[in-house]
Amino acid sequence: MADSGGIKVLSENRQARFQYEILETFETGIELLGTEVKSIRAGKVNLRDGFALVRNGEVWLHNIHISPHQQASAYYNHDPLRTRKLLMHREEIRKLIGKVEQKGLTLVPLKMYLKQGWVKVTLGLGRGKKLHDKRETERRRQDQRDIQRAIKRA
């Protein structure tokens, strides 16, 4: 899935768009170890349970599972669930702090991709959906599908 801008999507968190109403997105870099980069390039990453927190003026990514690299020994391999630092400009972090402190807003990873050889993460600022919101979204999506099918047949 290489796009024209040199972007290759490695992992996508489709569940996040179902569980959260995404209000804004941010592109961030991520601080990784060598074996983590190799595993990510092999597609061995899971963003599903991940979230980000702002602590001491830094953004940290939690609960992202990056599988240990197959060819590396146990001594040199990384901890799959370790907390990883996200790289953002100070101004972006300041804006983020104000928004995250609002009640009900959280940072979730939406996508991990390669951009010109660097691993990037797209963070989404989201508000959790209630069950009726999820049903409404699903209903709208189904109506769109029905409309498209009707247009195709006509």
Swiss-Prot record:
It is found in: Cytoplasm. Belongs to the SmpB family. Residues 133-154 have a biased composition (Basic and acidic residues). It comes from the Bacteria. GO terms for molecular function: RNA binding. Residues 130-154 are annotated as: Disordered. Keywords: Cytoplasm, RNA-binding. Required for rescue of stalled ribosomes mediated by trans-translation. Binds to transfer-messenger RNA (tmRNA), required for stable association of tmRNA with ribosomes. tmRNA and SmpB together mimic tRNA shape, replacing the anticodon stem-loop with SmpB. tmRNA is encoded by the ssrA gene; the 2 termini fold to resemble tRNA(Ala) and it encodes a 'tag peptide', a short internal open reading frame. During trans-translation Ala-aminoacylated tmRNA acts like a tRNA, entering the A-site of stalled ribosomes, displacing the stalled mRNA. It comes from Synechococcus elongatus (strain ATCC 33912 / PCC 7942 / FACHB-805). Its main location: cytoplasm. HAMAP family: SmpB (MF_00023). It holds the Pfam family SmpB. One of its GO terms (cellular component) is cytosol. Gene3D superfamilies: 2.40.280.10. This is SsrA-binding protein. One of its GO terms (biological process) is trans-translation.
